Amino acid sequence: MYIELVKYPDVFLRSDSKTVPFPLDDKTQRLIKYMSRAMYQHHGIGLAAIQVGYQLRMFVMDVNRSEEKPQVFINPEIIKKSKESITDFEGCLSAPGKRGEVKRYIRITLKYQDEKGEEIVKTFYNLAARCIQHEMDHLEGKLCIDYEKGNYSRDKHKSQTMVESDFRTKSDS
């Protein structure tokens, strides 16, 4: 079964994502598996819930593309960033054929919950750190193509119509 992603310029991608309540219900557990399948099917290394139509603060990641079991990040928060950063081009599964030049920290420390609700604090480097920052942007309604010469452009972001709602899904729109 082919999994369709929400694609730019759909304004749903500009939505802020909502906190995921614990314990996870069956629907959310199925959504995590669905997100993983979608990420692998589209040959990505990360995928946020908003990209499959859910305004939830979670994403999956597998920078090694092992296709075994991706890491699951629920209610993530970056709590520490390195001073060092690097600017590079990024693509996005929700914006095929488009790329943005994005400045990212090379090391971040992330606080998040796993599928059991356990709080985890872990430091990530290089590609994993870049991927996490990219997916975190999705949770805030930002896309890599919103960056101008490596820096986030508020004007470019504001030019998109923002969607306000509580915990809605793409199918509710």
Go through the PLM ranges and name each one.
Residues 1-173:
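Positively charged
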